[in-house]
Structures are given as C-alpha cells and as structure tokens.
Amino acid sequence: MVPSTFSRLKAARCLPVVLAALIFAGCGTHTPDQSTAYMQGTAQADSAFYLQQMQQSSDDTRINWQLLAIRALVKEGKTGQAVELFNQLPQELNDSQRREKTLLAAEIKLAQKDFAGAQNLLAKITPADLEQNQQARYWQAKIDASQGRPSIDLLRALIAQEPLLGAKEKQQNIDATWQALSSMTQEQANTLVINADENILQGWLDLQRVWFDNRNDPDMMKAGIADWQKRYPNNPGAKMLPTQLVNVKAFKPASTNKIALLLPLNGQAAVFGRTIQQGFEAAKNIGTQPVAAQVAAAPAADVAEQPQPQTADGVASPAQASVSDLTGDQPAAQPVPVSAPATSTAAVSAPANPSAELKIYDTSSQPLSQILSQVQQDGASIVVGPLLKNNVEELLKSNTPLNVLALNQPENIENRVNICYFALSPEDEARDAARHIRDQGKQAPLVLIPRSALGDRVANAFAQEWQKLGGGTVLQQKFGSTSELRAGVNGGSGIALTGSPITPRATTDSGMTTNNPTLQTTPTDDQFTNNGGRVDAVYIVATPGEIAFIKPMIAMRNGSQSGATLYASSRSAQGTAGPDFRLEMEGLQYSEIPMLAGGNLPLMQQALSAVNNDYSLARMYAMGVDAWSLANHFSQMRQVQGFEINGNTGSLTANPDCVINRKLSWLQYQQGQVVPAS
C-alpha cells in the first residue's frame, strides 16, 4: 500500500501541470477581437460577414461588429436594414463607438436624402477627435451634404479631405474641387473671404481667376495654367491637374473646312430643316458676333398690324407640325422685341468662311446609316445634324468617328468624345426656368402644364433641374383644353395654387426610403406638400390663348396678394401682342431667346424677313446661326470647361456630356411694356 503522504505529495506536484494545461487549452480556443482592425479601416468586408460576427460576439465586440454592419449596409444601398440595425444599438457606448454612431447617423441621413438633417448631425462632430479613416468619411459626408452647390465650406471640406486619400481618390477630389470652383459665377467668387493661413485655398482661387480671365482663349489658358503651376508648386492641383484642365492643355481646334449638314428636306419637318439651313448658310457667309443676353427697358410696340406668317410646305410654324420626335410642341408666335443690346461679356465670334465646303444631306430621303457612310467617303471634317430625335438615336448606334454637332438630344444622353448635343426644346427651356426661378430665391414652385405628353416631359425636366440645384419637392397641376378653361372662367372656379408632387423619373430610388420612426426622413422647409399657401412661384407652359384664361383664373381664386410670382415659357408669348394683352399679363415673367428679346435686332429683322414674320420659325433660323458658331468652336465646347458663346438662342455652355445649355433672356410685362425681368 502506498503511503498517504506520498500520494498527497504527488498530487501537489501534478496540480500546476494540470492547471497550466487547462489555461493553455482555454487560450487555444479563444478567438482574439478582430473588430478593431475593421473599425480602423485596415480591413474590410461585406455586411453579411459583419452580421455573422455580431451574432457570435458579445459586449463591446458585438457593438463594434454591429457598427461595422451598419456602415456596410449603407454603403451597399440597404438603407432600410441599416436604419433597423442602427435603432437596435444600446444606449451605453464608449467614446469611440459614440463618435462612430454619430457619423453613421449622418451617413444614413444622406442616404435618405435628408441633407439638412445630415448637416445638423455633422455639426456635432469635431473632426480632430476622429480616427483618420473616420475623418475621410466625415469630410465626404460634408461634401455630399452640400449637394454640389459651390461654397467656401464645400471648398474647405474638399481641401481637408485630400491628404487623407489614395492616388485614385485624390484625382476625384481634385476634379470635384475644380468643379466647385468652375461652377461659381464671377460675382460669387468675388464675395469669398478666406483666412490668411489658407494657402491651398488661395492657390485654388488664383487658378479660378486664371480660368475666368482666359476661358474663351485656349492658348492664353494654357499659358496661364503653366504660370500658375510655377507659382503654386505645392498645391495639390499643381501636382495633379484637374482633368478638365488637362483637356485644355491638350486642346486642338477642329476643322470646319468641309461641313456636312444633315437635315430633313421633305415631309412635315422640311420647314424646320430648310429654315435651319438658311440660318446656317447666312452665318457661314457673313459670320457671327456676340449677342447681348440682357437688354435695356423699352416700351413694347403695338405690332398687331404685322403680317401673319405664310404657310410653307403646308406647315405655317413648328407649332402646327405633327413631328413628335423633333422638339415636342413648339411655341406660338413670339413677343415684341425690346431695345438695343448691351455690351457682351463673352466676346466669342465665328468668322465668315464663304469658301468652306458645305454639303447638305437629306435625312428624310434615305437611312441615316447610308448618309453617314457617304459623309465619311466625302471627307467631311464635321457633321452638323441630324435634327430629328430618332435620327440622333440612330447616330449613336452607328459609333461614327466623325465630330458631330447633333441638333437634338436622345432620351438617354451618352458621353461621346466626338459628339455634342444642341437642342431647342420645351424641356431645355424648363431647365432654364428652374435655374432662373431658383436664382430669384423661390423655394416652393408649382408647375402648371397641359394634360399631355409635352406637359409630362416639361414637368419632369423642371423637377430634375430644381432638385439638382438643391431644391425640394415640386408640385404639378394639369389643365385641359381652351374650352375647359373658358368654362372655368365662366363658372368662377379659378385655379388654386395646389398640386401633386412630381417624382423625377431619373432620380427615383425606392431603396433609399424607410418607415423607421427613429431615422426617418422628414420634410424640410423646402420639401413641402400640396399646401396652396406655401407656393411662391408658378411656372406656366401654355399657348397665348390658354394663358389669357389661366392668369385671370389664378387671380380669381387667390387674389392679387397670393405672394406667388408667375413665370411662363416662350410658348405663351406672342409677337402680335397688343396693349390689352400686355396689360392683362402685368407682372408675368417669360423666357425668350436673346435674338427675339432685342439682343440682335439686325439678325432678328433678317430672320423674320426670311420666314414671313413667323416668330417660331425665326427661332429655328437663330438655331442655324448658332449651329455655325458652335461648329467653329466645337473643340472648345467639347474640351474647355466653362467656354461660353453669347449666342442668338441663349448664352451657350456645355456640360461634361457636351449637352449645350442655353441661358435665356427673361422679360416681364410692366405697365403695358416689355422690360427685362429684375
């Protein structure tokens, strides 16, 4: 028998070994906390991974995985799930988790399009308290909350973010910085006030000044950029130029020695094609000069005795033609011109070139594919046209290598390095109206449109542009025929300033909404509902006969003190307006092309003479003239951001897709006169 003393000694000696084994066994099965690496941004995964880790963890580690899952869900566009998980976060968080929660709340607000809510949350965060990867997200949230509206705060956010980014992201940041700078007007830029130690911002503003001074002269612009890079060698933009300015340095002018003009010369659209051809050939032979965008006030002459337009090819004007794929319903006869032009600020002209070879191709006589093949064989250096929308769609499918100034635009714009789009359409006019009304400080617009496809297109274009400019909900109200309007006047019903919200087709995103009460988007001051008293601007798209009923009906229902300013498209103005009509339209603002607003009286007289005083066709004539200017500056429009031509159809600039934007003249009826809108 073994002595009991020996057994106790042996057991005592074995105990440390057993305990050590148990300890090491426990260490072997324990998984270290990996959430920290993910929180710091040194590792990344998708939401499914984070959710799985969250289910398998507890305490602070579980909260970290939960925060990571929320961040991933927002990034993946699963906003509803992100909100649900966000609202399950516990109240007790450490400082690091609390900062992450606040940042996530702002990012969710941005995903929900609640920009004001996001800005309020971001104001509670001190960037210096954040980790480096959180700082990059914070500045990006500040940038997104600005909605692209240029401001000193946006510039500061972009500059603060730049050092935190990788090479690819740096280029995007620099391009965004330049986009903000080049989107400002010179007046906006002159009001900026910066601190003495903001050297990088000062450098950017000096580059902006170079651009303002030289944007219509590519050679001077190249020299100015090179000089700026020498003066600011440490500026991020000097080390890595904005893409738009790289394009300027690589600028080469396009040739217009051999031009192909693609137009419909037969059928209902022939009257438009031949009128554009007339304007184009006139400009080719005599050249063009800058046109005043704004004019001085003058009494409107009574032109009721003007001869009426004569019918050409069975169609008196674009308004009478059933050509749905051209530019939609065309405006009727247009307003009395006011006084002489003021001095132009964008001194860009297109010289005459009578010797340039011009060949006309009839798009109504053969398929566009055959025409393009022939154009290429003929050696054209640039194509102007086609005019009809369906032909522009065919043009894109052809993948032609030729430089093309299309005289319309497709439903879905495609960015092609060799194509620009120049259209005169009601949608284009509606976008300009949105910009004009927004510039006048209005917040709550109502669009009053005909019950038709035209009305739907105009409403969608206006709402898209309004929201792009940072506005909220736009209301719409539709009206019927002239006989229905007459009945409304006789019945004394009037028109209430109410309507239903427009949801722009291109911006609908059902994945960005949520019914969760904690982080649900709530309407801001400019995201109103159909409260008639809140409407402060009404944009009317109507014929002269329709607006003659509509304006009195608005006054009948709302009184003269409704507080809403009335605006109209050029469709509602008329070249033969007498004093009674002008007095009836008192206070109404309407848009017009500069040529017919008095910005180029000699050309207006020439155009009206050529089209038998049809103001609608005179617009197409002006389009032909401007097409010559654009063809001569095709490379500048395509490559030089901010290049501007003060044309007869508007102040012409191009967006990044080379869609030509037209800033129109705005006029107003005042005591029987037509004057510039204030």
From Swiss-Prot:
Task: Supply one GO CC term from the record.
Answer: periplasmic side of cell outer membrane
Among Pfam families, the record links this protein to: LppC
Family under the similarity heading: Belongs to the LpoA family.
Q: Membrane topology per the record?
A: Lipid-anchor
Q: Which domain of life is it from?
A: Bacteria
Lipid positions (S-diacylglycerol cysteine): C27
What role is this protein assigned? Regulator of peptidoglycan synthesis that is essential for the function of penicillin-binding protein 1A (PBP1a).
Q: Which UniProt keywords apply?
A: Cell outer membrane, Cell shape, Lipoprotein, Membrane, Palmitate, Peptidoglycan synthesis, Signal
Residues annotated as signal peptide: 1-26
Q: Which GO terms describe its biological process?
A: peptidoglycan biosynthetic process; regulation of cell shape
The ranges of region (Disordered) come to 300-340, 496-528
Entries under InterPro entries matching the protein: LpoA (IPR007443), Lytic_TGlycosylase_superhlx_U (IPR008939), Peripla_BP_I (IPR028082), TPR-like_helical_dom_sf (IPR011990)
Record localization: Cell outer membrane
Task: Cite the positions of N-palmitoyl cysteine lipidation.
Answer: C27
Supply the CDD domains for this chain: PBP1_YraM_LppC_lipoprotein-like
Recorded GO terms, molecular function?
enzyme regulator activity; hydrolase activity, hydrolyzing O-glycosyl compounds
- Record protein name field: Penicillin-binding protein activator LpoA
**Compositional bias ranges of the Low complexity kind:** 300-310, 330-340, 513-528
